[in-house]
Each structure stands twice: as structure tokens, then as C-alpha cells.
Amino acid sequence: MKNSLLPASFEPLLSTTDTPGPALSDLLALVGEELRADRCFLYLRNPKTVMGRIAFCWCRDASIPNVTESAWKTDISIALKDPLFAAALRTDPSIYVEDVKVADPAVVNQDFEARTFGHRALIHAHITEGRKLWGILQPCVFDQPRQWLASDRQLIEELLPRLLPLVKAYIRQTLG
């Protein structure tokens, strides 16, 4: 790809759908390292059943909370308390939050973010197809605000459509 910001190490993982679980897990680590994030998780959902869960989570070290969820659950009610999730369900463009503590309350529920995730800055990257939400990639940092650079944004936006086949394959294998 010309002008691609995706590192070459991403390509073999993005090219497989036979083993989507391990590929997605490994990709989170690569994304986390590339963006110098503290944590990177992947929320997956089946848009037909509206069942979702945080299926994968990479943490820079053991001091960072791992938020992986074991059970799939209906996710529509999350949108009532989380405007970021509501935006994802609408398939709005991805949202880059530089500081949760001063973000617009119409965009970020600061109390919900602090209580549920504890991060300070995040990317809420929506994996969509048409008007359907298939997942959310969420790199974040904890102790300080973070200005997300144009190169960070380009990497995320280039990666999202490439993740979709893996996400769909994982959901098919896991939920049928």
C-alpha cells in the first residue's frame, strides 16, 4: 500500500481469518506498542443479536487493569449511560479524546469512564460496515492527557476496515 502507516508486522495477522482470535490478540499488542498506549482493548459485537463483550485486552504492564469480559451480553443499554457507545451504535466517525477530565459531557460521560475504565485519554475507534457496528478498538493512556497525532488517526482509520474480516470471522466462530 502506498503511503500506508500500517507497520509491515501487521500484514500477516490481517491476512488470516482461519485463526482470528490469536491474530486479533497479537494485533492489539502491535497497536498498543505502535501508539505508545497503556492499554488497547477490542470490544466485539454481533449486530444481529446485539450481543457484545470486550473479547481481547492488551496491557503495557500488570499495573494496568485488564478489562476482558468472559460473557457475551446484550449491549443496547450501555448507550444510555455512555455517549461514546451511543456514537458507535450510530456508526459515527471514531472519536479521539485527549483528556477525559475536560471532555465535552455530550461526548464523554466522565464519571462512567473513570468508574468503568479509569483511563485519561482514549481513541474510541468504530469498526463498522454499512450502518452496523461490529466492534470498538480502544487504545488508551492512563496518567496524563494525550494529544492524538494525525499519524495516530491515520493508522487507526487505515486499520479499522482491515480488522472487519477478522472480527466477523471471530464472531462467526464464537457465536455461530
Please place each PLM-identified region on the residue numbering.
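Signal-transducing coupling segments at domain and membrane junctions
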Residues: E98-A121
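Regulatory loop-to-helix N-cap segments in sensory/regulatory domains
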Residues: V141-L159, V167-L175
